[in-house]
Amino acid sequence: MSPRPYQLQQRRVGMDGTRARIVSAARTVLVSGARFSIDAVARHAGVARLTVYDRFGTREGLLEAVFDDLAQSGGLTNLPEAFTQPDPIDGLERFVAIFCGFYSKHRLILRRLNALAVLGRGAAGHGDRNPRRLEGLTVLLARIAASGRAEAGSADVLHAVYALTSFAFFDEFAGAEADPAVVTPRVMALVREIAHLR
């Protein structure tokens, strides 16, 4: 029997390890406040620039991979829980809690990613995530409206709740207090007020 399949598996594991090391290095460079560049990430990961380009294609591809890693480690993969709650208000609360937890866990790096996006040097795909949050809120608020709270379904409510669940709002509102156990109920109280869920 040929050892080739085993060697291919070892190679795949090595490639995954290199990819993870590069993403980790990118996160470290972002948090450090140093200028974010492929060179800086490659140096920190101990690989050649070409290796970074080979794995991610572009700087934007690398930033997108960083955001995917943050989403995974920050709990955004739990978002389906918000849509499976029998009570749509409980679903909205779960949605808010998941985002507040994510923002709290990755606050510093999200500030840097948002700054890069504002400067036009961030991942183009990073901006596509906010419309996904809007879509999720649209579904949840429509469910609440259909359950007899018609005011929750208005466009004004949707846009206000969208603003209240943004990282920019969370970052300002939380101040020095980033504990999601403290911030989440305060954000949810504002969401309840705006959506007429008192």
Residues of each region from the PLM?
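Short glycine/proline-centered loop/turn elements that form peptide/ligand docking sites
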Residues: 35-37, 59, 147-153
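Hydrophobic alpha-helical connector segments
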Residues: 65, 78-104
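Alpha-helical DNA-contacting segments of helix-turn-helix folds
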Residues: 29-30, 61-70, 110-113, 129
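Amphipathic alpha-helical packing segments from all-alpha helical-bundle domains
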Residues: 97, 101-108, 114, 121-148, ...
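Generic hydrophobic, amphipathic alpha-helix propensity
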Residues: 14-26, 41, 51, 66-70, ...
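Basic, helix-initiating cap at the start of DNA-binding domains
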Residues: 1-44, 60-61
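Short helix-capping/turn signature of helix-turn-helix
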Residues: 56, 115-120, 167
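Short hydrophobic/aromatic patch on the recognition helix
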Residues: 47-56
